[in-house]
């Protein structure tokens, strides 16, 4: 068996990636989220495949086809709720994975980090298009509002929006193409994940100390396969509790009303995992400015390697920057809450303050804190 594992051209690749991979001996449970994201992706592709067998991407029948899946297809309700809540679990794991990367300075592996940002954009695009497919009120109005943001682009904006819509409003053509893209994107994401792993295995994993761990590596299997399996069990348990006991808790009640272009819902808002970005978008009165802030709220992650001023890699031994980090986490939770609130006092001013704080912490306060710590520890 050892010979096949190490000699066979295909199995050899799997062996070097998941079995004999030299891994730091001290990586914590925060390093579990990569494998959990892989599991989420597999769950989403499988449940999505079975949903696609029964779904029709036509404005006249899309809503009814989802109802048909839940009522008439064997375990259709389960597949539908696994897929809907699977997206939420996916984003929870994504945010924790990115948060771990920021905390432990993993962004210094620039290729892996940039690939991760591209993956984040791709997953967000996929989730947005998936939310449109049930063709409920929030699906329709969410699609209208978010795609309409592109009209803020000077000169080509209006033409671009109509090109994406396939007409003069969100209609049958839009739904059909969103379904096509929603179906193909997860497979593109899978390919990008392999590139992400390829870049990661060029440098090897980071670890909580941020120090070089070449002197103390252990094989991935059995140590981290077992550790990852514990993470898988915990995730599946949380996932099953969410799906079987509270399937609609993260959804919007408006989406149980069929799409109606003549009736606008009182509060148009995206799914919970986009609310922080939506709050940043809304906090700027100018349309183009809002769109730029929205894109920058994610793209700012790409600047992190260049904003790193500390001589230490991780935040493990840097209490000042640690404080900044946890303020940033609290700020993102505030933005998420604000994104779901109506546009009125005091939510507007809270959202604007939190948006300024978000960019200020990343661009100004964390780099300054790094320099102060260098000075205190006399690392200059």
Swiss-Prot record:
Subunit relationships: The cytochrome bc1 complex contains 11 subunits: 3 respiratory subunits (MT-CYB, CYC1 and UQCRFS1), 2 core proteins (UQCRC1 and UQCRC2) and 6 low-molecular weight proteins (UQCRH/QCR6, UQCRB/QCR7, UQCRQ/QCR8, UQCR10/QCR9, UQCR11/QCR10 and a cleavage product of UQCRFS1). This cytochrome bc1 complex then forms a dimer.
GO terms assigned for molecular function: metal ion binding; ubiquinol-cytochrome-c reductase activity
Name under which the protein is recorded: Cytochrome b
Keywords (A to Z) from UniProt: Electron transport, Heme, Iron, Membrane, Metal-binding, Mitochondrion, Mitochondrion inner membrane, Respiratory chain, Transmembrane, Transmembrane helix, Transport, Ubiquinone
Similarity-based family: Belongs to the cytochrome b family.
Annotated heme b b562 binding sites: 83, 182
CDD domains documented for this protein: cytochrome_b_C, Cytochrome_b_N
PANTHER family in alphabetical order: CYTOCHROME B (PTHR19271:SF16)
Signal sequence residues: none
One GO cellular component term noted in the UniProt record for this chain: respiratory chain complex III
Pfam families, A to Z: Cytochrom_B_C, Cytochrome_B
Binding site for heme b b566: 97, 196
Membrane topology: Multi-pass membrane protein
One Gene Ontology term from the biological process aspect of the record: mitochondrial electron transport, ubiquinol to cytochrome c
Cofactor notes: Binds 2 heme b groups non-covalently.
Cofactor(s), names only, from the UniProt record: heme b
Species lineage: Eukaryota, Metazoa, Chordata, Craniata, Vertebrata
Subcellular location: Mitochondrion inner membrane
Membrane-spanning parts: 33-53, 77-98, 113-133, 178-198, 226-246, 288-308, 320-340, 347-367
Organism superkingdom: Eukaryota
Miscellaneous field: Heme 1 (or BL or b562) is low-potential and absorbs at about 562 nm, and heme 2 (or BH or b566) is high-potential and absorbs at about 566 nm.
Task of the protein: Component of the ubiquinol-cytochrome c reductase complex (complex III or cytochrome b-c1 complex) that is part of the mitochondrial respiratory chain. The b-c1 complex mediates electron transfer from ubiquinol to cytochrome c. Contributes to the generation of a proton gradient across the mitochondrial membrane that is then used for ATP synthesis.
Residues bound to a ubiquinone: 201
Chief place of localization: mitochondrion
């Amino acid at each position: 068996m050892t010979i096949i594992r190490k000699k066979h051209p295909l199995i050899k690749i799997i062996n070097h990636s998941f079995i004999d991979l030299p891994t730091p001996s001290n990586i914590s449970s925060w390093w579990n989220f990569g494998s959990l994201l892989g599991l989420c992706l597999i769950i989403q592709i499988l449940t999505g495949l079975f949903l696609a067998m029964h779904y029709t991407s036509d404005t006249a029948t899309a809503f009814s086809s989802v109802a048909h899946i839940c009522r008439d297809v064997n375990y259709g309700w389960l597949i539908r709720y696994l897929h809907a809540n699977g997206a939420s679990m996916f984003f929870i794991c994504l945010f924790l994975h990115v948060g771990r990367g920021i905390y432990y300075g993993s962004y210094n592996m620039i290729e892996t980090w940039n690939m991760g940002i591209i993956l984040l954009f791709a997953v967000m695009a996929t989730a947005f298009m998936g939310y449109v497919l049930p063709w409920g009120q929030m699906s329709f109005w969410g699609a209208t509002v978010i795609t309409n943001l592109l009209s803020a682009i000077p000169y080509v904006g209006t033409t671009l929006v109509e090109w994406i819509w396939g007409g003069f409003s969100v209609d049958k053509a839009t739904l059909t193409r969103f379904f096509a893209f929603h179906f193909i994107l997860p497979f593109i994401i899978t390919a990008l994940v392999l590139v992400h792993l390829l870049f990661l295995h060029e440098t090897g994993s980071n670890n909580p100390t941020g120090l070089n761990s070449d002197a103390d590596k252990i094989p991935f299997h059995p140590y981290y396969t077992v550790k990852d399996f514990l993470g898988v069990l915990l995730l599946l348990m949380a996932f099953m509790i969410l799906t079987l006991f509270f399937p609609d808790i993260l959804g919007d009640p408006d989406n149980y009303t069929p799409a109606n272009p003549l009736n606008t819902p009182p509060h148009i808002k995206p799914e919970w995992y986009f609310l922080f970005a939506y709050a940043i978008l809304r906090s700027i009165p100018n349309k183009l400015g809002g769109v730029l802030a929205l894109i920058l709220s994610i793209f700012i992650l790409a600047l992190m390697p260049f904003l790193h001023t500390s001589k230490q890699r991780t935040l493990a031994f840097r209490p000042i920057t640690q404080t900044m980090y946890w303020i940033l986490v609290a700020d993102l939770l505030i933005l998420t809450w604000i994104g779901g609130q109506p546009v009125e006092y005091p939510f507007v001013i809270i959202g604007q303050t939190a948006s300024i704080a978000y960019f200020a912490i990343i661009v100004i306060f964390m780099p300054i804190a790094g320099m102060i710590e260098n000075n205190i520890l006399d690392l200059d």
